[in-house]
Every structure is written in structure tokens, then in C-alpha cells.
């Protein structure tokens, strides 16, 4: 799916890590929320409250989940899951990484 229809978008951006990650919250009619964003080349650590599925829209990244030793690579069309109350490191090396974060 390349677009979301019939949604509400929060106009104020979520800006993290001095602008290296910028996203907007999208709310659906059923109350579910997602964020749509971009991560610029960097290595960042994110903490989760709810479980998340990170869908790669464009670009590529490497990810290391909390408690794991190996980095895994993801490209457009792939996704990875992060448990609730956890964290993950993400490395974006070249092109900006475009994503949709599915919560819950």
C-alpha cells in the first residue's frame, strides 16, 4: 500500500535526535495510530513502549534488537518487529530511510 486514505495527520512533526529522525502521526478511523517518517544517515537507539512493526518503505538499514548480538539488514518492502518495553539500534548508512511504524 503506497498511501493511506481517510486518516487524520498530526501537523506538528515528531523530531528526534537533533532532526536525524522526523515523523508524523497518522490516526485511522478505528483509532489505531502509525507514524510515517524518515531517518537520515546515522546510528540511533530507540526505546519502545508498545510493540512495533517497522515497515521499510524506501532506503535500507541495519537493526540490532535489544539482547541480540547480530545486526540484520532490511530494505524496501521488508519489515522487522520490536517487542514492547524494549529497544533497538538502527543504522542508516547512505540514503535516507523511509518507514511506517505500526504500533501495537
Curated annotation (Swiss-Prot):
Keywords, in A-Z order: Glycosyltransferase, Transferase
EC number(s) on file: 2.4.2.1, 2.4.2.2
Catalysed transformations (reactions): a purine D-ribonucleoside + phosphate = a purine nucleobase + alpha-D-ribose 1-phosphate; adenosine + phosphate = alpha-D-ribose 1-phosphate + adenine; cytidine + phosphate = cytosine + alpha-D-ribose 1-phosphate; guanosine + phosphate = alpha-D-ribose 1-phosphate + guanine
InterPro entries: Ppnp, RmlC-like_jellyroll, RmlC_Cupin_sf
Class of the enzyme per the UniProt entry, highest EC level: transferase
GO molecular function, one term: guanosine phosphorylase activity
Biological role stated in the UniProt entry: Catalyzes the phosphorolysis of diverse nucleosides, yielding D-ribose 1-phosphate and the respective free bases. Can use uridine, adenosine, guanosine, cytidine, thymidine, inosine and xanthosine as substrates. Also catalyzes the reverse reactions.
Family: Belongs to the nucleoside phosphorylase PpnP family.
HAMAP family according to UniProt: Nucleos_phosphorylase_PpnP
Record's protein name: Pyrimidine/purine nucleoside phosphorylase
Organism: Thiobacillus denitrificans (strain ATCC 25259 / T1)
Amino acid at each position: 500500500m503506497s498511501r493511506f486514505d481517510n486518516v487524520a495527520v498530526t501537523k506538528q512533526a515528531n523530531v528526534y535526535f537533533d532532526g536525524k529522525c522526523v515523523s508524523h502521526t497518522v490516526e485511522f478511523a478505528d483509532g489505531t495510530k502509525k507514524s510515517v517518517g524518515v531517518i537520515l544517515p546515522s546510528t540511533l537507539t530507540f526505546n519502545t513502549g508498545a510493540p512495533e512493526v517497522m515497515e521499510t518503505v524506501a532506503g535500507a538499514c541495519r537493526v540490532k534488537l535489544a539482547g541480540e548480538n547480530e545486526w540484520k539488514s532490511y530494505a524496501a518492502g521488508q519489515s522487522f518487529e520490536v517487542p514492547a518495553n524494549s529497544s533497538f539500534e538502527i543504522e542508516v548508512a547512505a540514503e535516507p530511510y523511509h518507514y511506517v511504524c505500526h504500533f501495537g
